[in-house]
Amino acid sequence: MLTKISAGAPYGIATGPDGALWFTLVHQGCVGRLVPGEEPVVHQLDHLDGGPTVITPGADGAMWFTEFQGGRVGRITPSGEVTAFEASSPYGIVAGADGAMWFTCMQTDRIGRIKDGELTEFEVPGGMPSGIAAGPDDALWFTLNQGDAIGRITLSGEVTVHPLPTAGAAPVHITAGPDGALWFVEIGAGQVGRIDVTGKITEYPLPDRAARPHAIVTGPDGALWFTEWATGRLGRITVDGTIEEYALPEISAQAAEPHGLTVGPDGAIWVALETGALARIEVPGS
């Protein structure tokens, strides 16, 4: 099922504590909200050229998002009230075990932390930190897209880096898996990766190594779901490495261009399609 978003190009998507889907419109400077079955509501941000990208729920009942081009981290309440904080090239963002929001600074090789309006930044080894996720060990785990590595930062700022076996892997997004490990996608190598909290890494090649996997999330079925940007497909991988792929609906003659994805309030997988829609995919057996 497709929900067309006439206001622009969806990029990031997440389910909020209010039971709605929240998404970013990267080229229009907007954040949208959709209750499944209803019409979307779009909130225009103060800066049209901010490039809102990743969005995630915070511990405070609001949604938090990054504006990569505008250099801001934003907070939006269910009623649409927006607060912005200056940050350097923020991209990935997630709530940490300490109740703070943690985010990556892609162009300055830093990890940022914001709580109660106070911003702290931690230097990480060069490599363009991109996606970030909260691990089962209370640390934050992040990808180093140009460093071909996975990083770990404790709540106190101690950093460890785990190089990937594959050169040119270019990992992007990362998520906490159902098995106590972190799972990530390698857009450059066409692989899905797994790293446990001891640093042990396993990589699973996709059937099409040119699929350019972009984002990944744990599904309600105990598997990992991921987008394949180049091929317009949705992938599913079990914790033992079995891979399935599903075609996403196209809008007219345009390819889907899937980016972010989330488990919706209805238990389905919702995918942000940059060509102007949100796709809903039923989880088999649900």
Label each residue range with its predicted role.
Residues 34-38, 76-80, 114-118, 153-158, ...:
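Short loop/turn segments that connect beta-strands within beta-propeller blades
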